[in-house]
UniProtKB/Swiss-Prot annotation:
Pathway: Metabolic intermediate biosynthesis; acetyl-CoA biosynthesis; acetyl-CoA from acetate: step 1/2. The active site is at D146 (proton donor/acceptor). Keywords: ATP-binding, Cytoplasm, Kinase, Magnesium, Metal-binding, Nucleotide-binding, Transferase. The gene is ackA. It is found in: Cytoplasm. This is Acetate kinase. GO terms for biological process: acetate metabolic process; acetyl-CoA biosynthetic process. It comes from Streptococcus thermophilus (strain ATCC BAA-491 / LMD-9).
Length: 397
């Protein structure tokens, strides 16, 4: 038995889960927030206990040191030597990484180089990797890429209709994201369908603060909503999703300060989506509460969100010439019966029949009637488990 840590590091946070492998037993999990800010919070959950502490954490190295010390302090491990592998979620792997990879200095340099494709994610992941390499230099270090699952997309799906030089010189193309989640839930959906995944057509909807939809044909991603960066596709909590590119010069003509690329990136990534339309919140629970209270901006934000989700799901029926199932996963997908019902209400033409009671009260599994031509599943995602499995697989190579 060995112990593996799955890491999801952001610019100011570090989410982790410790597994006993290959048994896939979760020994502990935790979250460190506000890294680099005052009053950082570290939370550890294990054996039906939850322990939190507030302290100042300067950087990711200090965050990892606190994580490791907590594992000892709470007697979850006796020694650092028990940890033999660490897997890191990395959003953007570009065309360099077609699958999960052992991390050496070359791989780490490439991950940092690809930060332009995931400016909100890759820098944090790189910081997490460097922190573990400094503190536990001898363990197996693996990068698991959100984009890897989508490398099976055909060129017709991933190319943009811009001059060829932008692709050949700068690799401007669709890469997608949330691939680890889409891979996991599509495999689980195939089990629920009782069919080999190679014989299935599944539309997976990862609906959280970030949102992406993927067409999975025969277990392979054939199209996905996020694009060159995680900004593309469906409207999200604070991100625009797809836009007419002419909006950018149009706004710059009227607000010259928007000519700064960093300013545009910030507005479209941090001030848009549900937050931008509602002018209240990026949290769907707040949006629904506002809608129910008669707030017109919250109602519009909700309706726009549902509309964009429905359109992408519908278009992937066309991409695959049908679908056996739709899967909802991630925070909103798993927990908001309202959003699921609203989205599916506009897809009845495909033969979808939702069981209202199952949708409201059934947290996991099939939420359709026995007569539904297309099944709809609610499946909790488990990206950390996929990461731990890839570490175990690459350790034995």
């Amino acid at each position: 038995m060995t112990k593996t840590i799955a890491i999801n590091a952001g610019s100011s946070s570090l989410k982790w889960q410790l597994y006993e492998m290959p048994e896939e037993v979760v020994l502990a999990k935790g979250l460190i927030e506000r890294i680099g800010l005052r009053d950082s919070v570290s939370t550890v959950k294990f054996a039906d206990r939850s322990e939190s502490q507030t302290l100042d954490i300067a950087d990711h190295v200090q965050a990892v040191k606190i994580l490791l010390d907590d594992l000892i302090r709470f007697d979850i491990i006796k020694s650092y030597d028990e940890i033999t592998g660490v897997g890191h979620r990395v959003v953007a792997g570009g065309e360099y990484f077609k699958e999960s990879s052992l991390v050496d200095e070359y791989a780490l340099a490439k991950i940092e180089e690809l930060s332009a494709s995931a400016p909100l994610h890759n820098p944090g992941a790189a910081s997490g990797i460097r922190a573990f390499k400094e503190l536990l230099p001898d363990i197996t270090s693996v990068a698991v890429f959100d984009t890897a699952f989508h490398t099976s997309m055909p060129e017709v799906a991933y190319r943009y209709p811009v001059p060829n030089r932008y692709y050949t010189d700068y690799q401007v193309r669709k890469y997608g994201a949330h691939g680890t989640s889409h891979q996991y839930v599509s495999q689980e959906a195939a089990k629920l369908l009782g069919k080999p995944i190679e014989e299935t057509k599944i539309i997976t909807a990862h609906v959280g603060n970030g949102v992406s939809i993927t067409a999975v044909d025969g277990g392979k991603s054939v199209d996905t909503s996020m694009g060159l960066t995680p900004l593309g596709g469906v409207m999200m909590g604070t991100r625009t999703g797809d836009l007419d590119p002419a909006i950018i010069p149009f706004i710059i003509d009227r607000e010259p300060d928007m000519a700064d690329a960093e300013r545009i990136r910030h507005v479209f990534n941090k001030e848009s989506g549900l937050l931008g339309i509602s002018e209240k919140s990026s949290d769907m629970r707040d949006i629904i509460a506002g809608k129910e209270a008669g707030d017109e901006k919250c109602t519009l934000a909700y309706d726009l969100y549902v509309d964009r989700l429905r359109k992408y799901i519908a278009q992937y029926f066309g991409v695959m010439n049908g679908a056996d199932a739709i899967v909802f996963t991630a925070g909103i997908g798993e927990n908001s019966a309202d959003v699921r019902a609203s989205v599916l209400d506009g897809l009845t033409w495909f033969g979808i029949e939702v069981d209202p009671e199952k949708n409201v009260f059934g947290r996991v599994g099939d939420i359709t009637t026995a007569d539904s031509a297309v099944k709809v599943f609610v499946i909790p995602t488990d990206e950390e488990l996929v990461i731990a499995r890839d570490v175990e697989r690459l350790k034995t190579k």
